[in-house]
């Protein structure tokens, strides 16, 4: 009996006409795309922040992050949409997508490396590609959605927990 290759569970989602997937290990939850508050002076791909279960979460517009914008620079909208709450190590971000389709298990060997040209254009975000029915799905390398510098920049848009603010205010009184 031949041992089976380990399976990876992927959350499949769409942005425009393209299909993407993220390993389910990084996806905490799928939310409706609502309650996002803009934050001034953020990168164009940073949509804003939302409050979820007592924490402030930065929202990344994946369409803009991947450069999928109209000629006039505006990201096309398809209405509604979903937010994938993603765990990036110590950080949690929400990724705006058009729709979430399903969760599917694929053998690790089914995920093919993208061709060299594709790796050069979008390789920073890609783990590989997998065929789903008759469609090619780009599997994202979720930990690489943000660079270390971008993680630091996002820290500036999310206020510290209230306890840290109170502690800091108390230390100012001591000065």
Language model features with spans:
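An acidic, low-aromatic, low-complexity terminal/linker signal
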Residues: 1-175
